[in-house]
């Protein structure tokens, strides 16, 4: 009878046991390896997907490159932030002069003398082709000295400014500016010597004035429109009108009622020149504007010789400049 020698058979048994375990556990091991394959394959789709965002980012950069030069710095957006003159050149303001400017969005202080009027010099971009290209390369500040009575301008074919010097005490007009280096609009201004203004006894004023209302519309903010203005005062109250310069087509009625130094412009034309916006023409129209008037003494010491004021809304804005005309009785 042979006995099972466990000591001699133990190595063989263990070897068989290990083999059996390896074979039986192979399914688990293969499953584990099968689950790991997707992990090894992940980089392929990731790399493929990553290529697309990279291309999209480059496209966005290309699209955003043109506006880069128009990023509003303190100097570029200064006027529209109402701080251009004050931030860049506060020392050019005059404590002896008073004035205002009006644009499509703002009414600002404009206390510059006739010897240093704040304007902009716009330089166009000759290479602008696409709508995303900036139309302007730069807009530098220029201070203008008004030496000639009447209109002063730098370029008749495309002026950066047109300023009308009535006399040594008063001027009005406009200069061009741009907020985004693409769109240009006219900024309407006036200025006068503080000690030349009269605010007394205007309730007794009887006089006739003629001049112009210089304005732009939201449709074409860079195109100046000149309207002929007439305003006749009698005992502090006044009526008048503004006509289109070339056709005498009435654009506005002017009323001065309770306050002699405040005028109401009420549109009577459904469409203003250069505009495709419909105006509400009824009395007390929501499209009317209020203009504070300033009565200025002439250089010849004639009281209330000139009137200036500015006003506007989202459809139109401009400046009013008038001069007293002698009546037959005064002659």
From Swiss-Prot:
<feature type="lipid moiety-binding region" description="S-diacylglycerol cysteine">
    <location>
        <position position="21"/>
    </location>
</feature>
<feature type="signal peptide">
    <location>
        <begin position="1"/>
        <end position="20"/>
    </location>
</feature>
<keyword id="KW-0998">Cell outer membrane</keyword>
<dbReference type="GO" id="GO:0009279">
    <property type="term" value="C:cell outer membrane"/>
</dbReference>
<dbReference type="GO" id="GO:0009986">
    <property type="term" value="C:cell surface"/>
</dbReference>
<keyword id="KW-0564">Palmitate</keyword>
<keyword id="KW-0472">Membrane</keyword>
<feature type="lipid moiety-binding region" description="N-palmitoyl cysteine">
    <location>
        <position position="21"/>
    </location>
</feature>
<keyword id="KW-0732">Signal</keyword>
<protein>
    <recommendedName>
        <fullName>Outer membrane lipoprotein PM1514</fullName>
    </recommendedName>
</protein>
<keyword id="KW-0449">Lipoprotein</keyword>
